[in-house]
Amino acid sequence: MWNDEDNNPYGAFDSEARLSESLHSTTIESPFNHDYPPPPSSHSSNPDISDFSQHPEASDDDEGDYVGQANRAGYSHKSVYDSRIEQLLYENPDMPILITDAGKNHEGGGSFIVYTIRTGDLEVRRRYSEFASLRQTLVSLHPTLIVPPIPEKHSMADYAAKPTKAKEDAGIIDLRKRMLAVFLNRCRRMKEIREDGVWWRFLDPNVSWSEVLHSHPASSVPKNNLKAPPLDPANPTPAHAWLPVPSASAKLKSTSGTSSSPNAEAPGPEILGRFPPESRKLSEKDLDPYFINFEASTRELELLLQGNMEKVNRRTLAHLSGLSADLMELGARYNGFSLSEQSPTVATAIERVGQAADTSYIETEELSLALGANFAEPMRESAQFASVVRSVLRYRVLKRVQEDMTRDELSKKKSLLESLERSEQEAKRIEQYLNRTSPQAPTKQRSLSTSSATSSQGGTDESRPSGEETASIDSDFPPTHAEHVSQRYPESGQTSPPAHRKTSSGTFVANKIFGRISHAVHGFVDVDPERTRRDHIGKTKESLVQLEQALGVSEKDVKDASAGVLQDLKRFQKDKEADLRRYMVAYARCHLNWARKNLETWTEAKDEVDKIEAR
């Protein structure tokens, strides 16, 4: 029914197209049939009701055969196993992972809820926070995979309603038991997660989960997974350390320009949500619109599931719960009324109607529970999946932005290096010119010194400008230079000794003050621009080498990220189609069972009413 909905990010395609669209030759596995618990009450099919109740069962059997074949095909037996739990998982691919119990743990001085996980004959107890850390670790190790979600944490409304009992709410604990089991079984079907050495250790009772988190590969992933390769984040190369990190809200550059592939066409509205064709090799720029459209459609689906669908489901379940309570009260009233009736046939008929109301109450309550477990909860999980898909697509976008940033930074460094090299060449030309003209400089200096010496012998009136000249020199040079300049004029100091003492003390204070200023100025004034320029050129060349290596790994990362995301999106596509079909079948079966049981009991009540004898 979804084939015509192009805007649906999980839109189905033709069967042949779906089977041939795998980006890499991997086995696509379908969901287990035991992901969600069966309805609380299961009744045998009645062939007289409708053919619809028979076909889903037959098709489910076929699907079960396919599931078993797919699961067995996805497992490769090993000759040596690292632990008993790994052997169980590989040798029994159809064995479910169950959460059998949830209760308080009083060991270690704390009181918290732990969940008992059973895999075959092995059991391990884990907290909710450990499940959360497992999922976060899997997301870090596999950023291109759509890692299944786990139930959400307690909301602030829960804590406000039950400040001390929020974590012990039986309904929330039962929900977590079901959904955490679904999470573990979904992870088991993903080959990359199953073989990464982290997930199965979570199920091993002989392994400390804290030690797993602080050992390779979990501890080897960089804090920012953008500085690691997409397919192997636990083993980054040195070049990944030089990659720039874009902001979380960064966007791709406009893709409205000329396409890099001459035969590629930008996808129009008619193929929104579709995967790129395999017949053409598209560049990353040509792939961008497909991912962008898929992300936008996924966001729309998330809003739909979290908005209108969630409201309708909650309202329906509340209505069924209220109806069951009314039927319970109605049955009690009819039963009480039958006791006061004098006519035996009427009393029996009324009692039978009351029993039918009681049966309807029980069946309606079971219908409410079954719809909540088999339809409402999976729909909430689908909304969480939509958020996970958007985060994976966002990772690929950030990798593309990172590549563009690296390329831009490399271009800037090249321009800077060219500018520095031009400046270096200009400085060398100026130096060569000065070297050619430098032999004439000593003659001028000697003539100047001779004329200054002649003028210094002129008299007291002519010596006064020399003193002013000395003062100007003192103010322009550091104290060491000022002392050498003052030594050239000993005559003025000999003519007036008192003035000399006063001037020398003043000069000492001035030299001390100006010396500090000169030292401070030398701290931020380039005293050796030539050496600084050469150092800058060397550092720029080193940065160029690093950025060239970073650009190389960034281009490879983008290709790997696109391939990995596309591959897992196609796997996820098939799983979602099977999940959606299972949800709809479960929804119909719940109502069929409810209607069948009510039809039987009310038919019996009608027969009793027909037996009433009129007086």
From Swiss-Prot:
Subcellular localization, as worded in the UniProt entry: Endosome membrane; Endomembrane system
Annotated PX domain residues: 93-210
Principal place of residence: membrane
Protein name: Sorting nexin-41
Record gene name: snx41
BP terms from Gene Ontology: autophagy of mitochondrion; protein transport; reticulophagy; retrograde transport, endosome to Golgi
Domain statement: The PX domain binds phosphatidylinositol 3-phosphate which is necessary for peripheral membrane localization to the perivacuolar punctate structures.
SUPFAM superfamilies, per the entry: PX domain
Organism taxonomic ancestry: Eukaryota, Fungi, Dikarya, Ascomycota, Pezizomycotina
